[in-house]
Amino acid sequence: MSLRIVRLGSERHPDEGLRIGTVRRPPRGVPKQDFARRNFFDVWLPLLAPSEPLLREAQAAGAVQPGGAQAAGRVQGGGADERSWRTFVRKFRREMQRPDAARTLDLIAALSHATDLAVGCYCADETHCHRSILRELLTERGAAFAAGEPLNPAKKSL
């Protein structure tokens, strides 16, 4: 029983279990019935994605890429300045302190001890993506990660 942090649309691990999409929007141009078949997600949980206002603010500051559903929540790797990234991290962590989000994170952490789960986003680079922050938040809550799953791929948040 364990948790993985994944890129949505990537090939599934054999023991991955339920894949949860923590993105603001579902994949553009993909019929709902194909989300799981095409390895996006089994369950959509936008509650654990950055809010629309935070995404707009981060895009304006250059911390995240503007674009369609695939880019929603994608933080630029390399080109993002660290101050913008730190601001994004601080504000996203604050959003995840809301009772509904905090309880959901607690639930996922607890479930990781009872079943196999995966949480993901579309971003290619986890180090500059909200899923790296979710990884930290779930680690802080005692989530059981899959063997070989990095606990902290590149500590970027403050």
Model feature map: region roles:
Residues 1-158:
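Residues lining hydrophobic/aromatic ligand-binding pockets adjacent to catalytic sites
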